Amino acid sequence: MLVLSIRIKVWQTMESEITKRIVVPELEDILYKEHKVLDKGFVRLVDYMGSDESVVQAARISYGRGTKSVSQDAALINYLMRHSHTTPFEMCEIKFHIKLPIFVARQWVRHRTANVNEYSARYSVLDHEFYIPELDHVATQSEDNAQGRGNSLSNEDAQYVTDLLKRDSDMVYETYNKFLIKGVSREISRISLTLNYYTEWYWKIDLHNLLHFLRLRSDVHAQYEIRVYAETMLEIVKKWVPLTYAAFVEYCLESQSFSKSALSVVKKLIAGEDVAREDTGIGKREWRELMDVLADK
């Protein structure tokens, strides 16, 4: 075993010395490490290709590192991001191993620009692991957003909800086990399980489409349970491509876009004019969102 261990270490050392691929030390440090998300989930980086350098190289259609400075690279990446030149960002790819509740996975796969291979409950038995929200995340239905949360319930009501969720989740797993013991096929037995049970998958995507995913899913309006995954992945992207990340924050993540009518309102307000919503043709919701942006809420 000692000889084998030495050989493995020598091979790993040789590999790191002879590789010609772009290596990001900050990512090498976290390869295969679990980043805990929710109560039992995680995000684990398993592979990546490229870096900020790859984006710049693709944009310049050149080979090698060249002689450009970091400031010039940053300026170019800012330009690409600002003007939505997406192809250079597609030259970088990243692959994650993710453990997440099934209901989160069903939202996630609406982003169809990634490669996914999921744990199959047709071939394997699912573990007795399910998601139960923290009490402060159990809330009423939002009154102005058909797919969002409103105010948090009282601790007593939230505890009642989570107790029932746990009871039902345990109960359906007991039923699942009974089916398996009876010899019922795994593909039928799994039907009894609830959407809060955990699944796992490998998820590979290019940088451009990853940023689009993260812009939508890290937004405050995204469901909390998927947002925390996006926030974890954002931190990994920050280590991977810091120049691209900075441009993304500047021009996408923390920027605002306006409709033609909203932009007209902004111009009038800057000019000191009084503007009434009824005179603009803007709906109540868009108007409220515009006023919130201008008030920096």
Curated annotation (Swiss-Prot):
Q: In which pathway does it act?
A: Pyrimidine metabolism; dTTP biosynthesis
Cite a single GO BP annotation: methylation
Q: Enzyme group, top EC level?
A: transferase
Enzyme Commission numbers on file: 2.1.1.148
Q: Required cofactors, per record?
A: FAD
Residues passing through the membrane, by range: none
ThyX domain boundaries: 41-251
Q: Where on this chain does FAD bind?
A: T87, R110, H111, R112, E118, D206, L207, H208, H212
Any keyword Flavoprotein? yes
Q: What does this protein do?
A: Catalyzes the reductive methylation of 2'-deoxyuridine-5'-monophosphate (dUMP) to 2'-deoxythymidine-5'-monophosphate (dTMP) while utilizing 5,10-methylenetetrahydrofolate (mTHF) as the methyl donor, and NADPH and FADH(2) as the reductant.
Family in the record: Belongs to the thymidylate synthase ThyX family.
Q: In its UniProt entry, what is this protein called?
A: Flavin-dependent thymidylate synthase
Q: Which gene encodes it?
A: thyX
